[in-house]
Every structure is written in C-alpha cells, then in structure tokens.
Amino acid sequence: MMDTEKDDLPSATDHSEHESCDIPKTGGTTSKTASNSKDPSRPRRKKARRACFACQRAHLTCGDERPCQRCIKRGLQDACHDGVRKKAKYLHDAPDGALVPGAQGNFYNQANGLSKMSPSDFTPNGTNNIQQPKTSSIYASSTPSYNSNSTFDASSATNPSLPDSAALNPGPFTATPASPTFSISASSAMPALTQPANEMTTGAGQNSFGAFFDPSDPALFNFDLASMNFGNRYGALEFGMLGHMATGAGDTPPSDSGNQRGGSIGQRSNSQQFGNPTGAFTTESPNQQSFMFGDPVLNDWSGAQNTNPRMSVGGTLYGQGGGMHLLQQDAPHAYAIGSNTFASPSSTTSPHATTIAPSNFDDSPMKTKTVISTPHLRQQSLYNANVNKRRHREPSQIYDSVKEPYSYTGGFHKLIAFIKRRFSPPKTVRIAKALASIRPSFIATTKTLNQDDLIFMEKCFQRTLWEYEDFINACGTPTIVCRRTGEVAAVGKEFSILTGWKKEVLLGKEPNLNVNTGGGTNPSSQTDSAASSIRGGAGRMRNPEPITTNTAPVFLAELLDDDSVIEFYEDFARLAFGDSRGSVMNTCKLLKYKTKEDMDLVKSDDGRWNSHIVGKGGIVGEAGMNRLGFRDGRVECSYCWTVKRDVFDIPMLIVMNFLPHI
C-alpha cells in the first residue's frame, strides 16, 4: 500500500507525471536504470505542439490529445483546453482563434464543399443562395458566426453553372458580413466565355468607406493561405497583404481620378476577380468600368506607359528634331524605372478614349494617336506584352542562334580608321600608344583559341549581356555596355534621354547622322564643309561630315569629346589586363546627338536653352534632362566603368555608368 501511494507522487527527478507512468515496473518496484533521466535507452516523449491550460500552469509536459492524460488522471477532463500563449507585440490586435496552428485548414475548407455542389443547387432564374458552412467549434469564441445569403441576379443568364475555371483559384466563393448582397448586371454583348465566371463573382461590391480588405476572403488578393508554411492564419494574411502592397503599388493618381473614385462606388459590383491572369478586373457592361480592387487609381498606372506618347524616348519627341518644343512643364519625370513606368501627375489620361493632337508640337511629325483606355482591353494588351516579353527573354535562344564568332579584328580596324579621321596626329599617337601596350596581351591570350573557342566566347558574351540588360532596365542611371573594341552593345533609356542618341542608332539598326564631334565651343560651326582640314594640324578645328551612314554599332569614341577619349583609352590600357575587379572613376563630356537640322535650330535659339535651366535652378523631367548641353553639344558627367572578362581571361565587355553635372 505504501508503494502504491509512493508511485502516485511525482518524483523530484521526473519532468512530468506522464514520464513516471512510462517507467516499467517489476514486482512493485521501479527500475533504477529506467528512472535515470540521462539514460540514452530511456523512452522519450514527443513534445506537444501546445500544452493545455493546467499543464501550462504546472510547467509539465502535455500531449496533443484533448483532454490530456494528466487532466483525465486528475479529474479535470471537462476543463482541459489549450493554453493561451503570450502574443507578440504586432499580434496584440489579432483574435485568439486566428493564431491557432492549422487554422487555415479549418477557416477555408468551404471551397471544397462548394466545388462539390450539384447543378441542382442553382435555381433556374439565375439566382442561388449559398450558405456559409459552419466552422469548427474551436473558433466559436473568437470568430463571429453569421449566415449570409448572397443573391446573384444576372438578367441575361438563363441557366448559370459553376465554371470550370473556378478550379484554378482555390479561394472561397462565400459571402462576408461586409457585403451581404450583390447585384451583377451582365451585358448580352459580352463574350459567353466570361459570362459564367462573372455570375459567380462575389466580394466585389464592398463599400468604399469600409475596410481596405476583408480578412475572411483571402482570394480577394489571389493568394492561397493553405499553401503557405505559416503556423497561424494571421501571419499568412500579413505576409500575403505585404506582398500585394509591394507588387500592386501605383504612382500619383491622375487629376480626374477623384471624380471617378466618387462615382465608381456603384460600379464595383460587376468585376471579375477569379481566373484573371493579370489580377485586374474586367468589364461586364458597356456603360460601366471595372477597376483593380475597386479603385481606378490602381487600374490606371499599369497602362500609363502605353497610353502616354511622352514616355517614348526613342521617338521624335526626344529626338533633336523637335527639341525646341520640349519646354512644356508637364513632361514626365526623368529616370523613370521599370518597364511599366508610372504616369506623372500632369500626364493624365481620361477613362474615356482620348486623342492626342499634334497641335501642341508644332513642328513635330507626330501623328494623331487614339488612346484606348477601356480597362479590359488595356489589361489584355498588357498581358500579351508581358507574355511576348517572357518568350523573348529566353536564354536558350542565345546558344541556338550564335553560329559564328564575332570579328573583333574588323572592329579594331574600323576603330583605328575612325580615330585617324577624327583626331589630330598628336592625339591619334596617344591613343595608338595606349592600344599598342595591350596588343601583345591580346595576341598571347587568343593564339591558342580555335573556331569552337571563339564561338563559345561569343556565346558567353551574349549570355552575360542578357543578364546585364535586366540590370540596366532596373537601374535608373544612364548606362551603356560596350565590347572591347568600343562598339556599343547595350544601352539604357536614361542614356538616350541624356544624350539624345537613340538606341537603334547606337546599336547600328539605324543610320548614324550625327555631325557633332565636340571640336569647338560652338558646334554650329561644325556644319561647315567637310573638306575643312580633316588631316589638319593639332590647333585647327576638325569638323568632318557624318562619318558613315551605314548601319553599324557606334563606337564609344563617338560619344565622348577628344580629351575624354584619350583619357579613357589610357585608363583602359592599365585596367584591361590588370586588376580584374578594378574600376575607374573620372569626369568626361558626352557628345549630344545632333544632325544638320539640329545645328540650324541651335543657331536661332539665342541661348534660351541654357538660360532656362539656370533660371529655374535645375531640370524638370525627361525634357529637362534632354536640354542639358543642348547649345554647346556636350554634357559634363562623372562616370564609372569597369571591365568584365570572359572564361579565357580576355576583356569581354565594358560597363559604364554616367551621372550628369547639374
């Protein structure tokens, strides 16, 4: 009798009464070997995910079952429930039920029940009542229970059914207390493909003065909580919301969006949110518009670049032909980053179709352009553009397309011929000495390479350039990438804005008609006769006609003035086969792209370009960046460049970043 009472008492060396129960007994006595807590052969108990309230207060090991064994042994099985853990500071406003592990499996299992509904559950008149399933009793105290009936009234529907595309989105189609009733009016002119999905859409008619999102409807933001590895539903919601805010942010709203937002409260009930590849809502009625998340502000930014002709850099707007008409103060901001550039506050677009007339640009050859701003058409064109871009950005095409090595010998011959035409003999000698110092290294590294090695070298170049193009598009700094011969291989749009050189001209896709060589302080004198002393003395101004009109990549020496070219090649001779991770920081003067027509335009300017910049105290937008150095044809910059080598330790490409002096 004494042994039994002694066994019921917890031992000082045991951590819980469960552990004492697991110790084997022989003849009423406890084995000393099994009672040793440090014995490796002693059976270990699996830790519970969450202890009950009684075990938590007693600091004892609990189990996953409810009621647990200790509470059953003590007669507390009726009061055995999960203990409450201390919340983190950022979770103080979260309900207790949302923090229970595995809550996503119980909160959002209604979708499975809805997908099993038979067609008979829908009434013939186009209406159906969907009752939200009851949740588990564990959330009864934290989640308010409600029974909402969502009425879908489709006037053009005859026999609606659950679309097959609904399986693509596991989100629930249940109603929420914030929006109990929805009335969707479908147009007969809409395609039949989108009609079934529109009839099943819910949650779009929320009041604009309510919460920004409904926490009980995660499908509103197109992410599945069950697929996220989070221990609680609240953390998954927070993570998904942050991701939505990061990817769906928009720029300054258009000026007329205030009226749209006020009048769009009744238009939010006809939006399709499921099965949409772009995340934007489509339009179901010709008299109503659909907006991304019920707000026209977030819907306008995605197509701002396509609908705004001022965002074009390579066109005639930022070419020198229409340079005098860039004084508009509503020009877009400079250095806009990304493929879908946000619209500036002044470059607004109306929700209706607008026409850009060429009257604002008197001498510009821009034609009248109709801007289509219908939401579903704009979103479809954006989706097609993204698909085509992803198809084009396939690195495997590089290895299939490169069949021949690049002729660097011909490139160096063209470079030497250009240097002899443009520079005076003393400057030509300095550049030739710099190139001659690295010529033996080039010969030594390439003499053992065969045809396959040269083809592989070109594939490495194209593959590296493929990666650098992504960095150039993501970086707002004027950037160019050149081969070791100095031929331009890639260029960012910011560089085109700054210098006026179109991307097509730099890459050799269009003829080079530049006449600006930076020879004098007044570039208008450079349009004189091309026979004026091309091979003259060092002190004479050298102003040739356009060097070539054929389509060939532009050399880096054509983009810099004389002194900057000499300094670059002297630095390149030291860095080409020197420090593999070294870089050079220096100042230079970039030459603006100017044709003969631009030179005539500068003559009649009378200094208004530079005086306008000084008077304003800076630059405004892309037009202001384009005005830098317009009169003298040179832009003072600070630039940093480095040399990237290939697998044969040969200089492969030159990456250069420029920042103008304002």
Curated annotation (Swiss-Prot):
SUPFAM superfamilies: Zn2/Cys6 DNA-binding domain. Transmembrane segments: none annotated. It is found in: Nucleus. Keywords: Activator, DNA-binding, Gluconeogenesis, Metal-binding, Nucleus, Transcription, Transcription regulation, Zinc. Pfam families: PAS_13 (PF24990). One of its GO terms (cellular component) is nucleus. Residues 52-80 bind DNA. Residues 1-46, 112-180, 247-287, 343-365, 514-546 are annotated as: Disordered. InterPro entries: ERT1_acuK_gluconeogen_tf, PAS_13, Zn2-C6_fun-type_DNA-bd_sf, Zn2Cys6_DnaBD. GO terms for molecular function: DNA-binding transcription factor activity, RNA polymerase II-specific; RNA polymerase II transcription regulatory region sequence-specific DNA binding; zinc ion binding. Residues 343-359 have a biased composition (Low complexity). GO terms for biological process: cellular response to starvation; gluconeogenesis. Gene3D superfamilies: Zn(2)-C6 fungal-type DNA-binding domain (4.10.240.10). Residues 27-38, 112-162, 266-287, 522-532 have a biased composition (Polar residues). Belongs to the ERT1/acuK family. Transcription factor which regulates nonfermentable carbon utilization. Activator of gluconeogenetic genes. This is Transcription activator of gluconeogenesis TSTA_069700.
